């Protein structure tokens, strides 16, 4: 019985992950919004360790829905940024990201 339940659970989890819900933010991005053309991202650089303006380059960041999968649904405090995105929805890895203050 547990085998059948686990077989049925895998597609359900894959379906839930494949359809991101833009209205339900989790982790450090709750209530955070970015300007048009930018998206919430979780970065490997803490904003306290970034340059004088508090910016990091987008290459060290992942979009929120991808980063939550790799970080077990939790972006560490101080690692949430607004990063400029390309027209196809991917991050512009050469542009600077701006920290989101909690």
UniProtKB/Swiss-Prot annotation:
First and last residue of the signal peptide: 1-16
Plastid found in the keyword field: no
This protein's record includes keyword Ubl conjugation: no
Induction, per UniProt: Expression is increased during sporulation. Expression is up-regulated by carbon starvation, but down-regulated by nitrogen starvation.
Glycosylation positions in this chain: 46, 65
Tissue specificity annotation: Expressed in conidia and aerial hyphae.
Keywords on record: Cell wall, Conidiation, Disulfide bond, Glycoprotein, Secreted, Signal, Sporulation
Principal place of residence: secreted
Location(s) in or outside the cell: Secreted; Secreted, Cell wall
Coiled-coil regions listed in the entry: none
Cysteine pairings via disulfide bonds: 34-82, 42-75, 43-61, 83-97
Deletion phenotype: When the four class I hydrophobins (hcf-1 to -4) are partially silenced, approximately 10 times fewer conidia are produced an the germination efficiency of conidia is reduced by about 50%.
Family listed: Belongs to the fungal hydrophobin family.
Subunit: Self-assembles to form functional amyloid fibrils called rodlets. Self-assembly into fibrillar rodlets occurs spontaneously at hydrophobic:hydrophilic interfaces and the rodlets further associate laterally to form amphipathic monolayers.
Function: Aerial growth, conidiation, and dispersal of filamentous fungi in the environment rely upon a capability of their secreting small amphipathic proteins called hydrophobins (HPBs) with low sequence identity. Class I can self-assemble into an outermost layer of rodlet bundles on aerial cell surfaces, conferring cellular hydrophobicity that supports fungal growth, development and dispersal; whereas Class II form highly ordered films at water-air interfaces through intermolecular interactions but contribute nothing to the rodlet structure.
UniProt name for this protein: Class I hydrophobin 3
Species in which this protein is naturally found: Passalora fulva (Tomato leaf mold)
